[in-house]
Amino acid sequence: MAECGASGSGSSGDSLDKSITLPPDEIFRNLENAKRFAIDIGGSLTKLAYYSTVQHKVAKVRSFDHSGKDTERDHEPPYEISVQEEITARLHFIKFENTYIEACLDFIKDHLVNTETKVIQATGGGAYKFKDLIEEKLRLKVDKEDVMTCLIKGCNFVLKNIPHEAFVYQKDSDPEFRFQTNHPHIFPYLLVNIGSGVSIVKVETGDRFEWVGGSSIGGGTFWGLGALLTKTKKFDELLHLASRGQHSNVDTLVRDVYGGAHQTLGLSGNLIASSFGKSATADQEFSKEDMAKSLLHMISNDIGQLACLHARPHSLDRVYFGGFFIRGHPVTMRTITYSINFFSKGEVQALFLRHEGYLGAIGAFLKGAEQDNPNQYSWGENYAGSSGLMSTSPELGPAQRARSGTFDLLEMDRLERPLVNLPLLLDPPSYVPDTVDLTDDALARKYWLTCFEEALDGVVKRAVASQPDSVDAAERAEKFRQKYWNKLQTLRQQPFAYGTLTVRSLLDTREHCLNEFNFPDPYSKVKQRENGVALRCFPGVVRSLDALGWEERQLALVKGLLAGNVFDWGAKAVSDVLESDPCFGFEEAKRKLQERPWLVDSYSEWLQRLKGPPHKCALIFADNSGIDIILGVFPFVRELLLRGTEVILACNSGPALNDVTHSESLIVAERIAGMDPVVHSALREERLLLVQTGSSSPCLDLSRLDKGLAALVRERGADLVVIEGMGRAVHTNYHAALRCESLKLAVIKNAWLAERLGGRLFSVIFKYEVPAE
């Protein structure tokens, strides 16, 4: 913890707190490397954005020179590993109460050393009020930006870059949040910003929008009238009162006016006929809770009706709501959603945003950074440094509520290359990567959260073992353990905190936390050793395959693919075997496989297809290093090449578990080419192309792939997609519909999942699909 700001006397009301203790490692991370700033100051909350460079360790591989050596008998590693420092770009967003603003500015001033700019972009109603204070403290010139332009730029940015950013609120569901998949075409839409008043904007493109309406009755009205009615001055306390109120004690309902005759009008008797109608005639005192609830309903219903009236003439069916009025409060989202559904008769969808509070700050930052072209990159949410969507529902326990109104964080990492859809997706807007939504499935959620928690000891042990020469590896590993454990506890209480909860998001969060504490590739030495062993076995495996008849060889190739997929250090059932039995190899893995018929078995259809004309080009998403890629995937690739099929072999851009990376695949392919003329000529003639996916995940999102890979798929006319492994073909993409033939194959290495699918440990999925005509 560090002192933030000079000590001073206590403050209250609108005065600024100058004596606040902040944890800078958690709040203002990488501030010393901040290059550019933006700030959005509202009536009660400040949102700060800054761009910084982050230095972290990465594991690099480089091929040895094996010229003139006998590679079959050469027991040296196939490549060397070095850990290097790499600098990447990161966006930081921090949200805090205006009470903290002077203390935070003092802290920033004391720690700001490398900024490249003399200007800070500012937006929001408080930009004018605090202009002099900001310029005095930071010695940066304040450039004020248009509020609406910033909001729209920010909204477009999060919808494009953050999967599961938008959600609908359904009060009777468990959980109430239903997240939307990223739509490749987000325009047009209606943005309703509820600040002090209401602004309604039609957004047509990234640069074109039109203000179409608004109202003076908005969040400020709720706050102001609420303060008069309840004597409660704080906005969140008003919402807390409303959540405990019963509006029908104050409002006149339809049944109060029409009695039983309301049914002939086609109206529900519970509809509000007159807000605060009973207060004019009832001779009684109304509770603060009931009045706050009635006021919230009145304003939310008005906003919902206005949104519908403006959406319909423009034929818009999606309305995004933002502004300080919402703040993720369930009672607010519930009333707005009900209003939209009622007045639109279900034709218009009310959508809320996980990061709606940051839109203005994000937009202001983008305005100031236009010369750096931030929109030409793709960005990804860093789960390790983000606090997530923390509901302020009064039903939550005090541990969860305590975070409301303090500091919330969002971090986004700039990715090396733009990410786009796989061109072969049948219907990109309806594509959902994940097979099971753990926010929906309570039993699966409980199992997987416990599974990842119980695996922590092994992950920590592996991380420490990967850096034997580091004096602080154990200390950093314990910090990783604590951070990831805390994330898991948050997700137990609030599974919606980072969007849709899935096995993929749990795996990705773990990878982010490992990277946070400089464990870039804990399995690098394991992969190096296993690649070396598998390369020495490759010639013998190929000779035995070539000796088989054609039909027998096809089955052997598929079994080789499946046996290779057994070697997954992310599966406890496998890692236990590999650690206890160092001699466990390719043949032993084959004997572990389920006998045919498999759990999902389309092999006969695949064999029949192979008797037809060859495919033009196959896109193969590989899984693990070592035996999997070398003895399973490459013989399969070789057979396709012999049939006259071009092959695009796609591997992870960065490390995750023991998955093969693009840089490792290049070295492996080079070594195999030295042993096999088929692979050698295919590489030379560019009939075999090795590309990176743009991902560093054990799973696969076909809507976020490297732009170069997508271009190559179009250029080569790929007509077969092969997806291998549990993470890529079962946890994700099992139901993915493609416009071409596909193979999804995996060995189920988790007993609980196998039983749930109707099988047993090491059951086989071999799913061959042909698109409908």
Curated annotation (Swiss-Prot):
<keyword id="KW-0007">Acetylation</keyword>
<feature type="binding site">
    <location>
        <position position="199"/>
    </location>
    <ligand>
        <name>acetyl-CoA</name>
    </ligand>
</feature>
<keyword id="KW-0464">Manganese</keyword>
<feature type="modified residue" description="Phosphoserine">
    <location>
        <position position="393"/>
    </location>
</feature>
<keyword id="KW-0173">Coenzyme A biosynthesis</keyword>
<dbReference type="GO" id="GO:0046872">
    <property type="term" value="F:metal ion binding"/>
</dbReference>
<feature type="modified residue" description="N-acetylalanine">
    <location>
        <position position="2"/>
    </location>
</feature>
<feature type="modified residue" description="Phosphothreonine">
    <location>
        <position position="406"/>
    </location>
</feature>
<protein>
    <recommendedName>
        <fullName>4'-phosphopantetheine phosphatase</fullName>
        <ecNumber>3.1.3.-</ecNumber>
    </recommendedName>
</protein>
<keyword id="KW-0479">Metal-binding</keyword>
<dbReference type="GO" id="GO:0016787">
    <property type="term" value="F:hydrolase activity"/>
</dbReference>
<dbReference type="GO" id="GO:0004594">
    <property type="term" value="F:pantothenate kinase activity"/>
</dbReference>
<dbReference type="GO" id="GO:0015937">
    <property type="term" value="P:coenzyme A biosynthetic process"/>
</dbReference>
<dbReference type="InterPro" id="IPR002791">
    <property type="entry name" value="ARMT1-like_metal-bd"/>
</dbReference>
<keyword id="KW-0378">Hydrolase</keyword>
<dbReference type="InterPro" id="IPR004567">
    <property type="entry name" value="Type_II_PanK"/>
</dbReference>
<dbReference type="GO" id="GO:0005634">
    <property type="term" value="C:nucleus"/>
</dbReference>
<keyword id="KW-0963">Cytoplasm</keyword>
<comment type="subunit">
    <text>Homodimer. Interacts with PKM.</text>
</comment>
<feature type="binding site">
    <location>
        <position position="196"/>
    </location>
    <ligand>
        <name>acetyl-CoA</name>
    </ligand>
</feature>
<feature type="region of interest" description="4'-phosphopantetheine phosphatase">
    <location>
        <begin position="403"/>
        <end position="773"/>
    </location>
</feature>
<feature type="binding site">
    <location>
        <position position="624"/>
    </location>
    <ligand>
        <name>Mn(2+)</name>
    </ligand>
</feature>
<dbReference type="GO" id="GO:0005524">
    <property type="term" value="F:ATP binding"/>
</dbReference>
<keyword id="KW-0547">Nucleotide-binding</keyword>
<comment type="similarity">
    <text>In the N-terminal section; belongs to the type II pantothenate kinase family.</text>
</comment>
<keyword id="KW-0944">Nitration</keyword>
<dbReference type="InterPro" id="IPR035073">
    <property type="entry name" value="At2g17340_3_helix_bundle"/>
</dbReference>
<feature type="binding site">
    <location>
        <position position="659"/>
    </location>
    <ligand>
        <name>Mn(2+)</name>
    </ligand>
</feature>
<keyword id="KW-0067">ATP-binding</keyword>
<feature type="short sequence motif" description="Subfamily II EGMGR motif">
    <location>
        <begin position="724"/>
        <end position="728"/>
    </location>
</feature>
<dbReference type="InterPro" id="IPR036075">
    <property type="entry name" value="ARMT-1-like_metal-bd_sf"/>
</dbReference>
<feature type="binding site">
    <location>
        <position position="623"/>
    </location>
    <ligand>
        <name>Mn(2+)</name>
    </ligand>
</feature>
<dbReference type="Pfam" id="PF01937">
    <property type="entry name" value="ARMT1-like_dom"/>
</dbReference>
<keyword id="KW-0597">Phosphoprotein</keyword>
<dbReference type="Pfam" id="PF03630">
    <property type="entry name" value="Fumble"/>
</dbReference>
<comment type="function">
    <text>Phosphatase which shows a preference for 4'-phosphopantetheine and its oxidatively damaged forms (sulfonate or S-sulfonate), providing strong indirect evidence that the phosphatase activity pre-empts damage in the coenzyme A (CoA) pathway. Hydrolyzing excess 4'-phosphopantetheine could constitute a directed overflow mechanism to prevent its oxidation to the S-sulfonate, sulfonate, or other forms. Hydrolyzing 4'-phosphopantetheine sulfonate or S-sulfonate would forestall their conversion to inactive forms of CoA and acyl carrier protein.</text>
</comment>
<feature type="modified residue" description="3'-nitrotyrosine">
    <location>
        <position position="320"/>
    </location>
</feature>
<feature type="region of interest" description="Pantothenate kinase">
    <location>
        <begin position="2"/>
        <end position="402"/>
    </location>
</feature>
<dbReference type="GO" id="GO:0005829">
    <property type="term" value="C:cytosol"/>
</dbReference>
<keyword id="KW-0533">Nickel</keyword>
<dbReference type="InterPro" id="IPR043129">
    <property type="entry name" value="ATPase_NBD"/>
</dbReference>
<dbReference type="InterPro" id="IPR015844">
    <property type="entry name" value="PanK_long"/>
</dbReference>
